[in-house]
């Protein structure tokens, strides 16, 4: 057999070998080829809606503690405690509590579900009776979001909080300021600068203002005296 014949035979054998490999599913991947792995997110985001539904409970005078007393404009039987979910300043889901009038329970649940879905941050949320004498100043300095508290306004009339029809959100970073310079909380002077970008701040036209307004609630940030950035109410 000549050299040319050997080369032709080798070529034919090679072609048959290639066909056999193709019929068997193609050539094997090169040794050391990288494996494709789908990485899981290291910081998974919570679902758009709370995993746990809001829970509504009646309250009595004992449960309200120092936040209620005889002579308040509403009886404990008119109030409800809502346990609901919120996104904290740490970006995680938390459970908190608000006491509100029974007539606005549906509003409040819907509002905080909407704020949860857009991940608006709330630092903490607990009823004011957790603070000595249910002191509003202490709750505000703690940046605590709260609702019912039987307390009067400086004018002597009842605050809408005394009716369970008002909510204060992140009050340290959203302070109250009167024309005479009455600042609440007193530790919030730095946050009178509304160009700051601290989380939890509320600004005109933002998602918090729009969400409350859609349910007929008024924002104290629209008032002229006082200006109350933390405050939302429904009469």
Stretch-by-stretch model annotation:
Residues 19-70:
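N-terminal low-complexity, Pro/Thr-rich disordered segments
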Residues 63-70, 93-102, 108, 150-155:
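N-terminal post-signal-peptidase region of extra-cytosolic proteins
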Residues 40-51, 74-75, 105, 213, ...:
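Post-signal peptide N-terminal regions of Sec-secreted extracellular proteins
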Residues 74-140:
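Active-site acidic/histidine clusters and adjacent loop/turn architecture
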Residues 17, 116, 213:
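Anion (oxyanion) recognition and catalysis
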Residues 1-28:
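Secretory targeting and sorting signals
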Residues 152-158, 163-235:
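Catalytic cores and adjacent binding grooves of peptidoglycan-active enzymes
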Residues 126-163, 176:
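Active-site-adjacent loop/helix surface patches within enzyme catalytic domains
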């Amino acid at each position: 057999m000549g050299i040319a014949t050997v080369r032709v035979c080798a070529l034919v054998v090679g072609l048959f070998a290639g066909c056999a490999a193709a019929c068997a599913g193609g050539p094997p991947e090169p040794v050391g080829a990288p494996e494709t792995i789908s990485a899981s997110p290291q910081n998974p985001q919570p679902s758009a809606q709370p995993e746990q539904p809001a829970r509504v409970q009646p309250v009595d005078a004992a449960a309200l503690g120092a936040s209620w007393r005889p002579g308040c404009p509403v009886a404990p039987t008119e109030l409800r405690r809502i346990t609901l979910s919120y996104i904290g300043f740490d970006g995680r889901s938390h459970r908190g509590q608000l006491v509100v009038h029974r007539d606005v329970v549906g509003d409040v649940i819907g509002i905080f579900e909407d704020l949860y879905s857009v991940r608006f941050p709330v630092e903490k949320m607990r009823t004011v009776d957790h603070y000595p004498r249910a002191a509003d100043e202490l709750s505000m300095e703690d940046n605590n979001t709260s609702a019912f508290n039987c307390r009067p306004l400086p004018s002597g009339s009842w605050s809408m909080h005394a009716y369970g029809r008002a909510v204060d959100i992140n009050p340290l970073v959203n302070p109250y300021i009167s024309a005479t310079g009455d600042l609440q909380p007193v530790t919030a002077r730095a946050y009178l600068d509304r160009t700051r970008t601290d989380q939890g701040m509320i600004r005109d036209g933002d998602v918090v203002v729009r969400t409350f307004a859609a349910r007929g609630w008024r924002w104290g940030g629209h008032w002229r005296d006082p200006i109350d950035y933390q405050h939302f109410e429904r009469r």
